[in-house]
Design a protein with these regions (language model features):
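Extracellular glycan-modifying ectodomains
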Residues: 1-333
């Protein structure tokens, strides 16, 4: 094989050029894939653009506790909005013991659920059932159609970590991120600044997260790109909660007739900031004293509490959690 010095030199130059070009590619892939919020993660947006800039209150770790069920005064059944134990801290601060069960830990609220509670030692008299607009109909109908359930968690005592008062979206080394995620993230950040029409193209292509311009967005959010809001794509594919579902709420309450039951149904972030929905369900819920009207409350409080929902996430901020904790505590008492 004839390899002249000139060919070797050319090969070295090509290899060297590829190596130099690969450095920024690898750097972007490794350092632009650290996400703190679920909407920045699925949508590939930077925390630099969408993390909040106003400090949130700190919750002491001693308040983020789920008690053993046989010691609990209050039982909470909920989803990811309850899993962090943030809003329950309003109760634990007043020495009220709370046990929190995730929907996925039980066979829904079946007809024999009251018996399961007694068998597992629950002596309290108050139950809070938390759900979100997005999943409420499915959870309620599954419970209504369930006559007998066996699944019940054996250990409920646990603790949680407080949300950071202020995120520091510095570059972090992350080898677990997808190799292309860094490119998509930095591309989105550059494109949204270069064109105020980019969000139309982004939403057309995205099947996970959506981004929309929000009227008076900077009055509601503190993040750097506060004129935009991040939301779940699926919110725009499903109708809101039908007011007729209140009858099924009453049916579930009859199953739990030995207890004082309050329903905490949290609106989707998109329903508060962007997507118009009917408030009739929440109005009926409040009128029949089944639960607070969080839709009306959030519409009022989003003006007073900047970052009521976290800009980078579909969940509430710490201020938002403390608000619903205060409201539901007052309602159930």
């Amino acid at each position: 094989m004839n390899t002249s010095p000139s060919n070797i030199k050319k090969a070295c130059l090509v290899f060297g050029a590829l190596f130099v070009l690969s450095i920024p590619i690898v750097w972007i892939s490794l350092f632009f894939t650290t996400y703190h919020g679920d909407l920045t993660r699925i949508g590939k947006w930077t925390e630099h653009d969408f993390s909040w800039q106003i400090p949130q209150p700190a919750i002491h770790s001693s308040l983020l506790q789920s008690s053993p069920i046989d010691q609990a005064d209050v039982l909470v059944i909920g989803d990811s909005f309850s899993e962090t134990l943030h809003w329950q801290s309003i109760f634990t601060k007043d020495q009220i013991k709370v046990t929190t069960i995730h929907w996925g830990q039980i066979d829904n609220i079946c007809e024999n659920f009251k018996d399961l509670l007694k068998q597992n030692g629950f002596k309290g008299k108050k139950i809070i059932i938390q759900s979100t607009e997005r999943g409420f109909k499915n959870q309620l109908e599954k419970s209504s159609n369930c006559s007998h359930g066996n699944l019940f968690p054996k250990r409920l005592e646990r603790s949680s970590k407080a949300q950071a008062p202020l995120l520091n979206p510095r570059l972090e080394f992350n080898i677990n991120g997808q190799f292309t995620a860094g490119f998509k993230t930095i591309l989105n950040s550059l494109a949204i600044r270069a064109s105020d029409q980019y969000h139309f193209l982004y939403n057309y292509r995205s099947k996970s997260g959506h981004i929309y311009k929000i009227e008076n967005g900077c009055a509601y959010f503190s993040n750097r790109l506060c004129e935009y809001g991040l939301f779940f794509h699926e919110d725009y594919k499903k109708p809101s909660i039908d007011a007729n579902l209140v009858s099924k709420v009453r049916d579930i309450n009859r199953r739990l007739s030995d207890y004082k039951v309050s329903w905490l149904v949290i609106p989707n972030k998109s329903s508060i900031y962007h997507r118009p929905v009917s408030s009739e369900f929440w109005e009926d819920l409040e009128q029949e004293k089944l639960g607070p009207n969080l839709y009306q409350l959030f519409q009022e409080q989003k003006i007073l509490i900047k970052d009521l929902y976290a800009p980078n996430d579909s969940h509430l901020s710490t201020n938002g959690y403390l608000l619903i904790g205060t409201v539901i505590k007052k309602h159930i008492q």
